[in-house]
Amino acid sequence: QRQMCIRDRQSVLNGDRETGVTAMQMDVGLDTGDILKVVKTEIGVNETSGELFDRLSLMGGELILDTLSALEKGEITPIKQDESLATHTSKIDKSLCPIDFTKPSFEVHNKIRGLNPWPIATTEINGKKIKVHSSLLCEKSGKAGTVISTKPLIVACGEKSVELCEIQPEGKKKMTAEAFLAGHRLSVGDVIG
């Protein structure tokens, strides 16, 4: 139901399990035309918004061809959109980047996935800004923001925890958390964020 071109990113941020692409007739409004055809897809639990965008782009290309063919054959009946069901997404910007580890792990994980490839979720380790490119959900618990494992790098959240998989120190290239830890001091019990 979300409208506008950033809905794939918003779907990941919200933890939606499904999204899709829609072919619609153009009209004077923005995304208000009649619906011609819809294709839905599941969102992978670790899929980033960038990966989802790439998949939806391919699906959209196929949908255009299918829609034009079906229109030519008279197989499509346009469906009016119910504006009362429409939701509008908010702007995505760098103010969303800081990770709040007091949130449940699924919210932290969705933020990391949803802000990849831009603007990328961030945290601080030993007072230095770190971009977090990917994560995995974990079952372990601890005090929010506390490192509960360094092999792999797991940080406790408000509920459960996340493994930080790929990170990028300020001014450096993206690397695995393991590579980062080989050159930086971080111990179980340290607090990040």
At which residue positions do the language-model features occur?
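Donor/substrate-binding cores of folate-linked one-carbon enzymes
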Residues: Q1-H88, S95
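Sequence-level motif detector for i,i+2 pairs with an aromatic at +2
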Residues: E18, T32-G33, K94-L96, G127, ...
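Short, flexible, solvent-exposed loop/turn segments with mixed acidic/basic and small polar residues
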Residues: T87-S90, I154-A156
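Acyl-group handling in specialized metabolite and lipid biosynthesis
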Residues: S90-K103
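An anion-binding loop in the catalytic cleft
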Residues: F101-G193
